[in-house]
């Protein structure tokens, strides 16, 4: 657990050095998922569960939302990596799902950490601090993705759009499917 907090601190406070370190790490998708991602993705799921219960939501509906959110969060990181890997050839970039999975997982850190604000629904707006994750995505992209310089911005921009849309779906779908959208201010 201490290693996770060190990684969170490093990626948040020293992103350039952290990305250089991440680039050299040999992490399988399974290792990254089980040793890092499940823990940070649990933060908004658990915070949202407690926040929904606090606001008077039905316990089982809140649990259903939390399970959906957690699953969609993990799936979203995985899908973003797969989309980037698929798009890579269009931009003459290296196809390497492992690199794209590291990029999306570690850049999602502030997005998932900002989920702590789900604990108190009236301050959901502070979860916008998670937008720092898109900055980390920018820094990480230029540090770990192998792509010709002339194609780099285009590949980054298309990848960012895909990442952004998938993040929006991660946040919307669980609320809509579980019926908690009213409590979360979506409907």
Predicted region positions:
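Membrane-cytosol interface at the C-terminal ends of transmembrane alpha helices
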Residues: 75-91, 128-145
């Amino acid at each position: 657990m201490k290693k996770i907090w060190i990684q969170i601190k490093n990626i948040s406070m020293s992103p350039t050095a952290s990305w250089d370190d991440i680039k050299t790490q040999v992490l399988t998708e399974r290792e990254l998922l089980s040793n890092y991602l499940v823990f940070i993705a649990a933060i908004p799921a658990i915070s949202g569960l407690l926040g929904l219960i606090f606001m008077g939501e039905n316990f089982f509906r809140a649990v259903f939302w939390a399970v959906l959110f957690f699953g969609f969060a993990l799936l979203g990181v995985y899908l973003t990596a797969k989309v980037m890997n698929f798009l890579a050839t269009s931009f003459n970039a290296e196809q390497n799902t492992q690199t794209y999975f590291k990029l999306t997982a570690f850049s999602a850190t502030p997005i998932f950490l900002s989920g702590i604000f789900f604990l108190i629904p009236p301050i959901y707006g502070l979860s916008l601090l998670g937008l720092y994750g898109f900055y980390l995505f920018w820094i990480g992209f230029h540090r770990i993705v192998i792509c010709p310089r002339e194609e780099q911005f285009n590949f980054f921009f298309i990848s960012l759009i895909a990442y952004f849309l998938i993040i929006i779906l991660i946040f919307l779908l669980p609320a809509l499917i579980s019926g908690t959208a009213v409590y979360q201010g979506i409907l």
